Design a protein with these regions (language model features):
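Glycine/Thr-rich phosphate-binding loops that ligate phosphate moieties of nucleotide
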Residues: 1-34, 39, 70, 74-103, ...
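Short glycine-aspartate micro-motif
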Residues: 5-11, 68-75, 91-92, 132, ...
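Gly/Ser/Thr-rich active-site cleft segment
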Residues: 12-14, 106-204, 208-212
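Short beta-strand-to-turn element immediately C-terminal to the catalytic PLP-Schiff-base lysine
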Residues: 22-23, 82-85, 118-119, 141-144, ...
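N-terminal phosphate-binding loop and adjacent alpha-helix
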Residues: 30-67, 102-107
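Short, well-ordered amphipathic alpha-helical segments that serve as non-catalytic structural scaffolds
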Residues: 48-62, 161-165, 315-322
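A polyampholytic, Gly/Pro-enriched intrinsically disordered region
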Residues: 104-116, 196-201, 228-230, 381-396
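Alpha-helix C-terminal capping segments
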Residues: 220-226, 378-383
Length: 407
């Protein structure tokens, strides 16, 4: 019996690794989440091992050897930094704010301040570093032996680093691998790694560079043409709008799109997810499923938890209104539909409540973890199954479930 051809798509998060097997047309055969050991993920000398071990555990969970793997594509959060020396690692996670630098700097780079944190607070680690990678870049290195820095699009260079700025802060560019573009083929999976996945060591499986999770999520929701909107939530929540020019208004953040000449404008709600989780963890719902908790709150509107979700939903409504106001200046669209991704997209009760409060149509795609679909789109574009990321996204991203206001 012929095996189904799939891309093995990986996204490295802060507390877990997500993975899925996705076909050329966007069908998700299987998916899994591997939680990192809470003890190891807090140890900077073990974090990178957590990623590596979780990758192989995900492969085992998905039974990847039962499929014909045609590609692997990896994304992850940033700016996480992993120093590598003699096969030993030290990782400074993107959200580790336990340290500071003597003289804070003004820069557009999100990486240089983190590099300086590493340099000033861990001088011995810094001096012994052979090279420094992000999370996905480290896993790519482990699988292929290739050292790369993934630049999502040329306009992102200010958010990364330029040689002049590295010189100014006495950071050796030899520590930082050369830039490669999104989708770059880093190499093939080493035979010993294939064997750990119960795949023949002679098989040639290319590993493609997915890059930052924010970028792959925008690709995986097809937020790639002017007027498209997606709502990406986790500990924070970002409402994203694809535009043809930056929007210079208070509260809006502008970044390049992966589509040349386009931009992504986002309106950020910094702590919506965190606030709800903090309440949940301090209540009798601490160890119970999110969906059961939301269902209870919707039936018990006098509960403190309901007041929190009602407050959050109204903040989201206000953010949607701000984004839609800008969308209407860009397009003539009347039928507004917003694609939602992240943990929220897997919770039907929350999605319906959100639709009721915002009075908008909300969509969940065939892959609610949009980062994984973004990786599949990148892989299939590089495999020449599609002529561009945009063409692949148009075919592979499908609205699987629509939530319409009922109240």
């Amino acid at each position: 019996m012929q095996k189904e051809q799939v891309s093995f798509c990986i996204d490295i998060g802060t507390t877990s690794l997500k993975a899925a097997l996705i076909s050329e047309c966007g069908f998700v055969f299987k998916s899994t989440v591997v939680r990192f050991s809470s003890k190891e993920i807090q140890n900077p000398f073990e974090i990178a091992n957590c990623w590596k071990n979780a990758f192989f555990e995900a492969g085992k969970n998905l039974k990847v050897s039962n499929y014909d793997l045609v590609a692997i594509c990896i994304s992850g959060n940033g700016p996480t930094l992993t120093s590598v020396c003699n096969n030993k690692t030290f990782t400074l996670l993107w959200n580790n704010n336990s340290f500071s630098v003597k003289n804070p700097i003004q820069t557009k780079s999100i990486f240089i301040p983190r590099l300086l944190l590493l340099k000033e607070n861990f001088p011995e680690i810094w001096q012994n570093s052979e090279f420094i990678l992000s999370g996905p870049e480290f896993l790519i290195y482990e699988l292929t032996n290739s050292k790369v820095t993934i630049l999502p699009e040329n306009r992102f260079i200010q958010a990364y680093w330029q040689k002049e700025e590295l010189l100014e802060y006495e950071i050796s560019d030899k520590l930082l691998p050369d830039y490669v573009p999104l989708g770059y083929k880093a190499g093939f999976v080493k035979s010993e790694n294939l064997e750990k996945l119960n795949i023949s060591g002679s098989k040639k499986i290319p590993v493609f560079c997915g890059g930052p999770d924010f970028i792959t999520a925008l690709i995986g929701t097809n937020t790639l043409s002017v007027g498209k909107i997606c709502d990406r939530s986790g500990s924070s929540e970002g409402i994203n709008l694809c535009t043809d020019k930056p929007i210079q208004k208070e509260g809006f953040r502008n970044l390049p799109s992966v589509i040349p000449e386009l931009f992504n404008t986002s309106y950020l709600l910094p702590d919506t997810g965190t606030r709800f989780t903090q309440w949940k963890n301090s209540s009798e719902w601490k160890n119970k499923p999110y969906e059961a908790c939301i269902n209870f709150l919707l039936e018990n509107k006098n509960d403190k938890g309901y007041k929190i979700i009602f407050e959050i939903a109204n903040e989201v409504k206000s953010a949607f209104e701000k984004i839609i106001e800008q969308q209407k200046l860009l397009t003539n669209q009347n039928d507004i539909s917003i694609i939602c991704t992240g943990g929220q997209a897997k919770n039907p009760s929350w999605m319906q409540f959100k639709s009721d409060i915002t009075k908008l149509q909300l969509c969940v795609t065939n892959c609610p973890d949009a980062e994984l679909m973004g990786n599949a789109i990148i892989a299939n574009t590089q495999l020449k199954n599609y002529s561009s990321i945009k063409e692949a996204a148009d075919k592979m991203v499908i609205c699987d479930k629509k939530y319409l206001p009922q109240k």
